[in-house]
Design a protein with these regions (language model features):
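Extended recognition/assembly regions associated with phosphoester-bond processing machinery
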Residues: 1-305
């Protein structure tokens, strides 16, 4: 008789790696895209029960676990993000999703479990040591909670969020901060700056639209929505962003990549970018990794070579 709790390949396995990306839990309320913390907590607790209890388990939250990008402070969305601002944002999310953090604490209590938070474009504030300390304190397991950066590897598996391949959201891994007038600021990529200044003021009225897919069909059926967004970003790029450059705003920059992407998006009226080709080329170029897990796309895909 076969043990119904036996996992395929379990006799050879020494560790189970669970990768989850793009949860995007926010600060609660109608604007939060993830009101399911209790469900997620119950799901995660299963990795402390049979048949997984026989294995060491790594829970890898592969970027955009927290929607810090769309979390406001005092009703505003600052682009000059200090450690204090980042911590205040994270505290709002922790308060709204206690069930998630309680579940992580319970899982780590079992032993032979580790939790990793990879950085994504919605939670770049995770680079702040102060935010990392806050999360470790809330989960109450300092030595089992890790922050590997924008990617991590386990054996011959590479886990990366994927936003580092997106020119809108790429952050220099070795220079995630800016120094300005004695303050340490988060080096926000230009795509994040644009969303904070042009899109987030519309969130209260248009939050529902961000949850509709596929985007192309949504714009075909709701041309007024496309017009509102295009006009908002046109005004931003041709007036507000230029003003910031002239005023030497430290978080604003201009380069050929920015110019090219803005021209493309207005010319095609396509707000999204397909990065499939980039990852296909990486897979074909190197066989260093047997498995590569990528988030960011919000679309289920499977490639093999």
């Amino acid at each position: 008789m076969t043990d119904r709790w036996q996992l395929p390949g379990q006799a050879r396995a020494d560790r189970l790696v669970v990768s989850i990306s793009d949860i995007e839990m926010g600060a609660g309320g109608v604007l939060d895209d993830f009101p399911h913390a209790s469900f997620l907590g119950d799901l995660l607790r299963r990795y402390a029960a049979p048949p997984f209890d026989r294995l060491a388990v790594d829970l890898v939250f592969n970027g955009d676990t927290f929607d810090l990008l769309k979390t406001s402070i005092d009703g505003a969305y600052p682009i000059r993000i200090t450690a204090d601002v980042a911590v205040a944002k994270m505290q709002r999310i922790i308060q709204a999703h206690s069930a998630f953090f309680d579940a992580l604490n319970d899982i780590l209590d079992v032993g032979r479990r580790r939790v990793f938070f990879v950085i994504g474009n919605h939670d770049p504030e995770l680079v702040f040591p102060e935010v990392q300390a806050l999360l470790r304190a809330r989960i109450r397991h300092d030595h089992e909670v890790y922050f590997p950066g924008f990617a991590m590897s386990v054996g011959d598996a590479l886990i990366e969020h994927g936003s580092q391949a997106d020119p809108m959201f790429r952050v220099p891994p070795q220079q995630p901060f800016l120094a300005h007038r004695g303050e340490r600021l988060l080096a926000l990529p230009w795509g994040a700056v644009a969303l904070l200044e042009a899109a987030m003021p519309l969130q209260r009225d248009l939050f529902w639209a961000d949850r509709l897919k596929p985007r192309k069909l949504v714009f075909e059926l709701l041309p007024e929505l496309r017009e509102v967004l295009v006009n908002a970003f046109w005004t931003y790029w041709t007036r507000d962003y230029v003003r910031g450059l002239l005023e030497r705003d430290p978080v604003k920059q201009v380069n050929w990549t920015l110019f090219r992407e803005v021209v493309y998006r207005f010319g095609s009226q396509d707000p999204d970018m397909s990065m499939g080709d980039i990852h296909h080329r990486r897979l074909q170029k190197s066989d260093r990794w047997r498995v590569r897990t990528i988030g960011h796309h919000h679309q289920a895909q499977w490639w093999s070579y």
